[in-house]
Amino acid sequence: MRDALASEVEATGDLARVTVGSITDRAGLTRRTFYSHYHDIADLVSQTEDDVLRDLRGLVADVASVRLEDLYETIDELEPCPGSVELLEYFKANGHVLTALLGQGGDPAFVEKIKVMVHEVVAGRALDGIDARALGAFFDYYLTFAISAEVGVLLRWLAGGMREGVDVMARIMTLLMFVRPGDLYDNTMDFNIPAYGLAVMQRLINTEEDSDDE
């Protein structure tokens, strides 16, 4: 029924226009069969998304568990981040349903659910070994930026019909994590990110202290 749901979203261009009747007709099933599994269309969508989120949580955790030292080594060897191929293979295998739900006619809230899940999985691992002075707003915005960027790349890949192979896309996403301003224009901006970030955080702390004194 999930493939039928995806096909109906594609056919109508809008999840809100999908009906139980259209899904059962496309799937060659009876309404009784549908209602023996789901309460309504919203329940079908919810269960589908919950299953995807559960599957993705484990795959994202595998990627997040990679140590920076190991990641640097794989990049030197022009290999993708460990775990990224498996993650993309999941998207490829479930591309029909994921493209429908994450596309323009799908469920806008689903993208945010994925971002929240990734944040939950990655945040704890990202804190390991971090300079305590970088915690707070700077770290939160950095994580939000990184997650939104990676999820955005995945959505672009889906929307483009996943033309690039999994191995190629895994390497692209790995490299994108380390692209600096100017890298693509032979004019790399090589500046001290930790020092800059800590200076920004110190300004924030000073501003908050000044506000408390007023």
Each model region followed by its residue ranges:
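Amphipathic alpha-helical packing segments from all-alpha helical-bundle domains
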Residues: 105-131, 137-152, 182
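A short secondary-structure junction motif
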Residues: 8, 55-59, 63, 94, ...
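Localized chelating/binding microdomains
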Residues: 3-6, 10, 24, 37, ...
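Short, hydrophobic secondary-structure boundary micro-motifs
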Residues: 17-18, 99-101, 166
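Hydrophobic alpha-helical connector segments
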Residues: 60-96
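C-terminal peripheral helix-coil segments that are non-catalytic and often amphipathic
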Residues: 123, 127, 140, 148, ...
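Alpha-helical structural segments
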Residues: 3-7, 26, 43-66, 82, ...
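Helix-turn-helix
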Residues: 11-43
